[in-house]
């Protein structure tokens, strides 16, 4: 624990805790402070002026990161017939219907994204208690309940990131890897922030996007000036 504390203190050196950095400078700092022996994920957190306990203040959506996420995303698809063939052709890792239901019910959940055709949602609905808490339940609002399974699989594999506001009014997501060049990370962050801005609910009052910070998996958080991220 002492070594971990020393590493964290060292990483925070040179950071001004109360300063709001321009996004370009913030990303340079995040990359320079990443010291783990693996390719850390660059993460964004956004504090929103919403209370998600109210239905008209829920924030949820999906963002297609222009430069991908750097993650290997495993995709499961509930589909039959030609749509199942489309899913396999698009690169889905596991495809099925009742057979896939049995696999998931048996506790084997080896996927990061779950897609379903609308006709199979009554079947998938039986898995609500399993998939729901893991954030894997297909939802038409984020494009994972669709007849275009080929497009949905391609999006998931290509860097589509789902987001949903948490109880404290915070959204966080991985937006790339520290190995990405700075400009690609900035482009991803701006695209993600823009998607969250466009998902502003009707019940939101006052300042919607209040605070933004970026960090790496093991690094310190860097506060960001929102105006340098938001395009509108």
UniProtKB/Swiss-Prot annotation:
It comes from the Bacteria. SUPFAM superfamilies: Ribosomal protein L1. GO terms for molecular function: rRNA binding; structural constituent of ribosome; tRNA binding. Keywords: Repressor, Ribonucleoprotein, Ribosomal protein, RNA-binding, rRNA-binding, Translation regulation, tRNA-binding. Gene3D superfamilies: 3.30.190.20, 3.40.50.790. GO terms for biological process: regulation of translation; translation. InterPro entries: Ribosom_uL1_bac-type, Ribosomal_uL1, Ribosomal_uL1-like, Ribosomal_uL1/biogenesis, Ribosomal_uL1_3-a/b-sand, Ribosomal_uL1_CS. One of its GO terms (cellular component) is cytosolic large ribosomal subunit. It holds the Pfam family Ribosomal_L1. Binds directly to 23S rRNA. The L1 stalk is quite mobile in the ribosome, and is involved in E site tRNA release. Protein L1 is also a translational repressor protein, it controls the translation of the L11 operon by binding to its mRNA. Belongs to the universal ribosomal protein uL1 family. HAMAP family: Ribosomal_uL1_B. Part of the 50S ribosomal subunit. This is Large ribosomal subunit protein uL1. It comes from Methylorubrum extorquens (strain PA1). The lineage of its organism: Bacteria, Pseudomonadati, Pseudomonadota, Alphaproteobacteria, Hyphomicrobiales. The gene is rplA.
